[in-house]
């Protein structure tokens, strides 16, 4: 497992999940889909946000990817869609709605809370 994932806070984990899901949904190549889904699952394993937040992001990704992004030459810009998605404020809205850092008492480990909610 990538060591960096242990250093991300809850917000970073959730945004990285959203980006992974977007990439996996944006491309038809099985290798890309599989890698993106494995990455998304890793972020879920380390995160503490509710499952409803992940489901809500999946729905928002599906809607976002319906937007038409074309380069000057007419080629699709799927990665750009995903970058715009995670920077659009949509992911932050969902995170804020389900933010696991709102209540320290819900955490079993105070040190983990301090690390993940910085």
PLM region spans:
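N-terminal secretory signal peptides
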Residues: 1-42
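Compact alpha-helical subdomains of small soluble proteins
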Residues: 36-118
């Amino acid at each position: 497992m990538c060591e960096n994932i242990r250093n991300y806070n809850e917000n970073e984990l959730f945004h990285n999940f959203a980006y992974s899901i977007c990439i996996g949904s944006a491309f038809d190549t099985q290798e890309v889909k599989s890698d993106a889904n494995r990455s998304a699952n890793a972020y879920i394993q380390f995160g503490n946000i509710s499952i409803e937040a992940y489901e809500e992001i999946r729905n928002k990704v599906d809607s976002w990817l319906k937007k038409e992004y074309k380069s000057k030459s007419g080629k699709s810009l799927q990665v750009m869609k995903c970058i715009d998605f995670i920077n659009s404020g949509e992911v932050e809205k969902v995170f804020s709605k389900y933010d696991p850092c709102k209540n320290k008492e819900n955490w079993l480990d105070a040190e983990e809370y301090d690390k993940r909610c910085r």
